[in-house]
Regions:
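Extracytoplasmic beta-sandwich strand-turn segments characteristic of Greek-key/jelly-roll folds
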Residues: 1-11, 67, 90-114
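Extracytoplasmic entry segments of secretory-pathway proteins
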Residues: 1-67
Length: 140
């Protein structure tokens, strides 16, 4: 096998290593951004139960089925449930977090456009799961 060159294999291995390093660095960066909750974020408790959502603001104000927030302000959701497992989802803002009894899961977001956006349960939670919806209302 004299004259056989390994250069194509080494180039292939080098390209794969560079791509894996890039994907790993991007994944680490995204994880770091997701975990960094802004210091001024308002905490909103989100409680799922068959078959509606309850929202409790830091000042004690409660809303059922509708959540009113301000545009360009950060919010941290503390999500739990009173009964079976649910999954809190605001599709337009890529918010998706499980609601598990006895546990508080956190996720944050900062709405950047005003309007009304659907809130849904993304975990089958019983007979009326399809009707477990709410509305996020982002105000100027």
């Amino acid at each position: 096998m004299s004259g056989h060159s390994n250069w194509p294999e080494w180039i292939y291995v080098g390209v794969v290593i560079v791509l894996l390093a890039y994907v790993g660095a991007e994944a680490w960066n995204v994880e770091r951004l997701v975990d960094h909750v802004p210091a001024d974020a308002e905490v909103i408790k989100v409680i799922g139960q068959q078959w509606f959502w309850t929202f409790e603001h830091a000042d004690g104000t409660k809303e059922v089925g509708e959540l009113h927030v301000k545009k360009n302000h950060a919010y941290k959701f503390e999500i739990t449930t009173k009964d079976v497992n649910h999954a809190f989802n605001i599709h337009d803002y890529v918010v998706l977090q499980d609601a598990v009894a006895g546990r508080i899961n956190e996720v944050w977001f900062a709405p950047d456009k005003a309007g009304e956006f659907p809130i849904q349960c993304r975990e089958y939670c019983g007979l009326l799961h399809y009707n477990m919806r709410g509305t996020l209302i982002v105000e100027e």
